[in-house]
Amino acid sequence: MLGAITLTRWGRYKPIHVLAFAIQTLGLGLFTLQREETTVAQWAVFQCVVSFGGGMIFTTMLPAFQAFVHERDLAACTAAWYFIRLFGHVWGVAIPAAIFNNRVDALLAQGAISDPLIARIISAGGAYQAASAVFVEQFPPALQTEVRAVYRQATQRVFQIAIIFAGFAFLLTLFEKEVELRKTLETEFGLEEIEGRKEKAGTEK
């Protein structure tokens, strides 16, 4: 909301994008600091930082995308934008899942889990599918510690890679082209309909 309000007030999207990606990169870096003993207050603050940056991005990228096209093409432009965004969401799930599972398998190969049965359960994508407190708490305390350590390290790897993506996006925003957003609309939509009504009214009289 803050990003949208700022964009509406000043009509400049590039500074918002630069700041937003910088904040998001910082927030992802904070995520990598999480440990088993991290408090609820700490990870809640970390999430707020990432959400603040991400929210500023999502609410201001569409106007920037639309700024370069003619008003008659805005419908097609908006449809293309949402297609690209949904396509990105697909990769936003697939890539972290692949990174997570690969890291778990690497840790298991290093002997991170002492019980072969549990290691087999969480290998080959099993850890991603079974990620829940109920799953972890069914094991003895010693094995719970091992399983939590595997999950923590795999999750850290996901956020470490995410930092690269966010940092690269931040660098791209430094070279982002900025154009002045429209303050008035010069569209043909609605004019013919109004004129048609006037002609129809004149004919009926």
Predicted regions and their residues:
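Alpha-helix boundary/capping detector
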Residues: M1, T32-L33, A109-Q110, I121, ...
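Short, intrinsically disordered low-complexity segments
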Residues: I84, N102, Y128, G196-E199
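Extracellular/lumenal N-termini and interhelical loops of multi-pass eukaryotic membrane proteins
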Residues: I99-Q144
